[in-house]
Amino acid sequence: GINPKPQSQGALDSVRIRAKYMDQLGVNSFVVIDFSENFSRITACGFIKLLLELTTPEAIVVGEDFKFGNPSDAASALDLQDLFLKEGRDVEVDIVEQILTEGGEKISSTLLRRLIKNGELKYFFELSGQSFQIDLMPIPYRFDDGKLVFSTDAIHQLLPPLGAYDTDLILSD
């Protein structure tokens, strides 16, 4: 996964939650790349070389609109196979077609962020197949008069608007 750009409006989940999803899907190698200014300058070939330094992929799954590399040397999902072969690696590339809502809107992280911002968590679940989760494991908290109290300033995920939500609280992994 790629952590969002610093100027973004928050992550959909934490790296810990994302790693848990990947494990449930049977993914045995998971690389988190911090989308920094230095990273944004990497060429498409440099990106492939970096992936091969960090892991030995047998297969990679990307969306059909996946792009990588700096704008002056960018590549798309269709270029992945050839770029891996240039590095001497035969990596299976699975390109997933875009999935649209019933209204024809592309299901994307942008759409999912909008649903969270609008508090539309049931629709978020319908589209993503996952309940919206807030990772409180690294957040200091206390119980005060039977209520869980923590600072939302310490949460780096995108949060829904203030309000009352039907939730499950899980205090361990």
Please describe what each predicted stretch is:
Residues G1-E53:
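Core alpha/beta nucleotide-donor-binding catalytic domains of modification enzymes
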